Amino acid sequence: MSSDTNLSNPPKVGFVSLGCPKALVDSEQIITQLRAEGYSISGTYDGADLVVVNTCGFIDEAVQESLDAIGEALTENGKVIVTGCLGAKKDAAGHDIVSAVHPKVLAVTGPHALGEVMQAVHTHLPKPHDPFTDLVPAAGIKLTPKHYAYLKISEGCNHRCSFCIIPSMRGDLVSRPVAEVMLEAENLFKAGVKELLVISQDTSAYGVDVKYRTGFWNGRPLKTRMTELVAALGELASQYGAWVRLHYVYPYPHVDEIIPLMNQGNVLPYLDVPLQHAHPDVLKRMKRPANAEKTLDRIRAWREVCPDLTIRSTFIAGFPGETEEEFQTLLDFIAEAELDRVGCFAYSPVEGATANDLPGALPDEVREERRARFMEVAEEVSARRLQRKVGQTLRVLVDEVNQDGGIGRSSADAPEIDGLVYIDPAAKASQRYKTGDFVNVKITGADGHDLWGEVA
């Protein structure tokens, strides 16, 4: 095949991306490499020469969704390569789950396996002779809107929580070199990104695997450590008038060091801290650190340093052996801590998790009932805290402009998981601001999730 033919009719790869933001970053890296090697990305099964499905395998519902997506791709296209967390899962006999259910897939890899995925693509769909490296931006190909992006700083996790199997799929913590992280952040800001969302399995543990060794960025030393990285990212973001938001922050002692940076405006006053529960006995069964009293003290101290701090967390209701008293402790904690944003999952057994062997498994209806009670309390807390913002003027990042006005997010709202700010008036909204702009909005109303306001 001639070079001209390759250029005019490049091989086409379809892509299905499932799962969490960490998986989304993996998808972006694969798509970036595909484009760099001259492949084009097809938006339909019919138009693709083969399909890559990036899967999730964390909970049973995600496993089924991934298996269904693989089945659909096989039916609609027939040539499918599977990657992601589900690709690393084995059944009781030690066979990989994907191949057992869908034996016609071309190849199966685990998560964060760019090299293996590309090797499989090359085997079943040879790459063209002329790479389109000049068509790939320095920031890479992104699956998020142009004005925000995820920045993954590490892979894997050193924790062994009893309800989780991520370490068995993604391995132990491996931190990215600090200079590499900073370069990616700079390229993203140069490409117009206005909000950088820092993610990992455990952001607070960044650098522990390399003993916090010192790297270099722009000719100056920079430790591979969360505090130093966050400070450098905040300084860089300020040069572009952009936001930096932190996710998956475990409440280690050194987290206290970044709260002053938030109060100074270096990074957003927003902490995503996965607490999971409040009762010490449940936390022990979960193999999680901390206890409710110490956590409450930490939260109070953080808010004294940074009064505008928004705290998001996730919890599990109905964990094996959870008594009504233990669950009530969790409800009391939520009310007293006044967490701004929370998510709650009814416990769901995950194949391969050690929590499956714990006694006291609760019926589905009990788990769901407790989740509903939890969310009722959490929404009351959220409504109270949001009501306090009425009358304030907030800086809002615009996500969408339509005939009804603008829709955006404040510093308290991460994309997809938190609330929204609805911006009035609708008249001439598209002439006053556009997606990706920052606008000042005076808040005029609130409910349990969202805010309403007018351009100030």
Swiss-Prot record:
[4Fe-4S] cluster 2 binds at C157, C161, C164. The lineage of its organism: Bacteria, Pseudomonadati, Pseudomonadota, Betaproteobacteria, Burkholderiales. The keyword Iron applies. Its EC number is 2.8.4.4. Residues 143-384 form the Radical SAM core domain. Coiled coil: none annotated. Residues 387-456 form the TRAM domain. Catalyzes the methylthiolation of an aspartic acid residue of ribosomal protein uS12. One of its GO terms (biological process) is tRNA modification. It is an enzyme of class 2 (transferase). It is found in: Cytoplasm. It comes from Cupriavidus metallidurans (strain ATCC 43123 / DSM 2839 / NBRC 102507 / CH34) (Ralstonia metallidurans). Its cofactor is [4Fe-4S] cluster. Belongs to the methylthiotransferase family. RimO subfamily. Its main location: cytoplasm. Keywords: 4Fe-4S, Cytoplasm, Iron, Iron-sulfur, Metal-binding, S-adenosyl-L-methionine, Transferase. This is Ribosomal protein uS12 methylthiotransferase RimO. Residues 11-126 form the MTTase N-terminal domain. SMART domains: Elp3. The keyword Oxidoreductase does not apply. It catalyses: L-aspartate(89)-[ribosomal protein uS12]-hydrogen + (sulfur carrier)-SH + AH2 + 2 S-adenosyl-L-methionine = 3-methylsulfanyl-L-aspartate(89)-[ribosomal protein uS12]-hydrogen + (sulfur carrier)-H + 5'-deoxyadenosine + L-methionine + A + S-adenosyl-L-homocysteine + 2 H(+). HAMAP family: MTTase_RimO. InterPro entries: Elp3/MiaA/NifB-like_rSAM (IPR006638), Methylthiotransferase (IPR005839), Methylthiotransferase_CS (IPR020612), Methylthiotransferase_N (IPR013848), Methylthiotransferase_N_sf (IPR038135), NA-bd_OB-fold (IPR012340), Ribosomal_uS12_MeSTrfase_RimO (IPR005840), rSAM (IPR007197).
